[in-house]
Amino acid sequence: MSITAQSVYRDTGNFFRNQFMTILLVSLLCAFITVVLGHVFSPSDAQLAQLNDGVPVSGSSGLFDLVQNMSPEQQQILLQASAASTFSGLIGNAILAGGVILIIQLVSAGQRVSALRAIGASAPILPKLFILIFLTTLLVQIGIMLVVVPGIIMAILLALAPVMLVQDKMGIFASMRSSMRLTWANMRLVAPAVLSWLLAKTLLLLFASSFAALTPEIGAVLANTLSNLISAILLIYLFRLYMLIRQ
């Protein structure tokens, strides 16, 4: 059976339109969870203000130089802020991936689905999804730090791993290995979608500061919701593609 990207795009668009409100609510809930967790675990405003005290930003040649010029207390505050942002983002992404994939499974089985039901049904797989997304993010970030291109390649090769983990109940490393093999064999179908997703997320990041015109909290929720919707579209595409490849 010949699979064309155009047919998968069409199926993705139809599913997204038909389930838009449910996907929007899941995206909004995940964005809210991400922002709340980030706020809870982040340093206080007073602590964050200390980061600017006595640090010669203009004279620093790079990020590592800037960090080296910080006091141990400032470095600890920066580490806490970075860890809070990373942890809350990973939690939100894991819930989003689990929720969206469960929506697809439930709808495909002819069952009625709501945002809360999808998230609740995904609860048993969230720990494995969290670890998978953490490892994937780590590998992609390391690749981007090296020469950028390896990170993009890793993002493409591991794209199907969450779908395989949930749909086929694979282990974390088994899903990563299987994703690499299957994606490599179907690069022409996976790569354009992942690259479009990366481009859309980058463009959103460039305009993210404009959302803060509302209030920082509302702006963060809105930006995260839009980011989640972009990721949801990619997940729908990858799930549909994986089902067609398996046939």
Curated annotation (Swiss-Prot):
It comes from Escherichia coli (strain 55989 / EAEC). The keyword Transmembrane applies. GO terms for cellular component: plasma membrane. NCBIfam families: PRK02868.1. This is UPF0259 membrane protein YciC. Its main location: membrane. Pfam families: UPF0259. It is found in: Cell inner membrane. It is a multi-pass membrane protein. Belongs to the UPF0259 family. The lineage of its organism: Bacteria, Pseudomonadati, Pseudomonadota, Gammaproteobacteria, Enterobacterales. Keywords: Cell inner membrane, Cell membrane, Membrane, Transmembrane, Transmembrane helix. The chain crosses the membrane at residues 20-40, 87-107, 118-140, 152-172, 187-209, 225-245.
